[in-house]
Amino acid sequence: MSSDSVVAGNISRADVERVVRAVLTRQLAGATTSSGSVSSAGGPPNPLVVNISARHVHLTEEHVEVLFGKGVKLEPMKWLYQDGYYAAKQTVTIFGPRRRMIPDVRVLGPCRNASQVELAFTDGISLGIDLPVRISGDHHDTVGCVLVGPAGVVELKSGVIRAMRHVHMSPADCAYYGVKNGDEMDLKIHSGPCTTTLEHVTVREDKDVKLEVHIDTDEGNAVDLSHATKVELVKPVGCGCHSK
């Protein structure tokens, strides 16, 4: 019998706990979860997690009532990785300028001060919208769309964006990587023959966040994130062309 084998009749609770701990430790060293996200541990103060941010909508309280009815509040359906944030039960239909639509787009909570629609590049093609790449909240020179809910319609004049890929970092994470809010990093995704580096990952620093990278569905598919075995954040190094 192999030294790695365990006889079922003699296994104890301690043996089970030891095996489970060993498996979890190996998985945290770089494993893909069922949700398509990837985590990588070892080194930084917090484990690095990369998640795909699918198309979604952020709404003001006023727009929630217009779309879903007076007095209606967003109802959490699934809690997200960042504490306090969730995918709501409510969804809307998005109409673009060519009267093309995308139905059942999830609303994320909690509510914001300004409504915003975040789409992938291919979503923009479907709707006939030339999506500008923006950090969340930057609606300068952005287009609008029409949101339709079960109780009403909201016409947004602006706020439809393709979210710039970014990483949420705490002050401790920033100190570890030697970066600050607004800096850019590189994300290396090891995924078999499809190992890829995504540049220009913008740092978003906040004291109350977990270390997490957000990329959109197009980017996640391009790097084959669902099969990734390891992810790394790297501070870009200049080429030295202008150094003395």
UniProtKB/Swiss-Prot annotation:
Residue numbers binding Zn(2+) 2: H166, H168, H214
Residues holding CoA: I52, S53, A54, R106, N221
Disulphide-bonded residues: none
Cofactor section: Zn(2+)
Binding site for Zn(2+) 1: H56, H58, E118
Cofactor binding note: There are 2 Zn(2+) ions per monomer; Zn(2+) and CoA bind inbetween the 2 domains in each monomer.
Predominant place of localization: other
InterPro entries found in the cross-reference section: PTAC
The reaction(s) this protein catalyses: propanoyl-CoA + phosphate = propanoyl phosphate + CoA
Top-rank EC class of the record's enzyme: transferase
Intracellular or extracellular location(s): Bacterial microcompartment
Entry keyword set: Acyltransferase, Bacterial microcompartment, Metal-binding, Transferase, Zinc
Enzyme Commission (EC) number: 2.3.1.222
Residues at which phosphate binds: R112
GO cellular component term, pick one: bacterial microcompartment
Keyword Ligase applies: no
UniProt function note: Part of a bacterial microcompartment (BMC) locus required for growth on plant and algal sugars, including L-fucose and L-rhamnose. Thought to be active on lactyl-CoA in a lactaldehyde-degradation pathway. CoA is regenerated within the BMC via this enzyme, although there must also be cofactor transport across the BMC. Directly targeted to the BMC.
Cited PANTHER family: PHOSPHATE PROPANOYLTRANSFERASE
UniProt free text on domains: Formed by 2 beta-barrels, each is capped on both ends by short alpha-helices.
NCBIfam families membership: PRK15070.1
Sequence similarity: Belongs to the PduL family.
Protein name from the UniProt record: Phosphate propanoyltransferase
Gene name as annotated: pduL
